[in-house]
């Protein structure tokens, strides 16, 4: 997105801190539109037509919660795409943001459904139905530092919206990045950093 999001994150030379960093959304908008809306929605539509992209997945019994998302969109006068979509997929194809539903089940808080066109090195079809610890398994330090805090956060989460930002540095500015580089990231010479490294951030 082309909004001045860079000022919303705390960049550290040693990398992103391992913390939740949640804040009250307050009067900030939940859904954002910017100059990249048309190309990003076009990319979402293209990805949704490719079954191998796995940009929408759902467990059973998620439609009621997804219909609530549709209602929230309608209350905000958001234009929704037409078609015979699952309501969460319909909502996801209508906005620039990706959308995930987290449900409390016997195994904890699980990823129950998602319209995820812009993953950052993870595959939705491998994570659907898994609890938060399993979803974040590759995140270094998650289980030791964040697992308990995240579960408590979801247990206590009320109707008032909260938000956070994460950030990464990748040698690729593609929005759709489901794969981790084989053998790790390439070594970028210092002379090429400005052209070949990109700060990627997700507003959650």
Where in this protein do the model-derived segments appear?
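Extended, well-ordered protein cores
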Residues: 1-204
């Amino acid at each position: 997105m082309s909004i001045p999001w860079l000022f919303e994150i705390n960049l550290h030379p040693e990398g992103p801190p391992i913390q939740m960093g949640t804040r009250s959304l307050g009067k900030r908008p939940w859904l954002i539109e910017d100059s990249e809306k048309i190309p990003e929605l076009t990319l979402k539509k293209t990805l949704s037509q490719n079954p191998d992209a796995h940009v929408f997945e759902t467990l059973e019994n998620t439609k009621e919660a997804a219909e609530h998302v549709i209602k929230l969109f309608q209350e905000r006068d958001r234009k929704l795409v037409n078609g015979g979509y699952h309501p969460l997929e319909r909502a996801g194809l209508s906005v620039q943001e990706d959308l995930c539903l987290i449900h409390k089940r016997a195994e904890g808080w699980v990823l129950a459904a998602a319209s995820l066109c812009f993953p950052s090195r993870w595959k939705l079809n491998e994570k659907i139905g898994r609890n938060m610890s399993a979803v974040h398994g590759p995140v270094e330090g998650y289980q030791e530092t964040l697992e308990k805090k995240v579960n408590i956060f979801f247990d206590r989460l009320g109707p008032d919206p909260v938000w956070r930002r994460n950030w990464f540095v990748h040698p690729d500015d593609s929005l759709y990045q489901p794969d981790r580089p084989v053998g790790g990231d390439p070594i970028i010479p210092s002379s090429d950093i400005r052209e070949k490294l990109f700060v990627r951030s997700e507003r959650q």
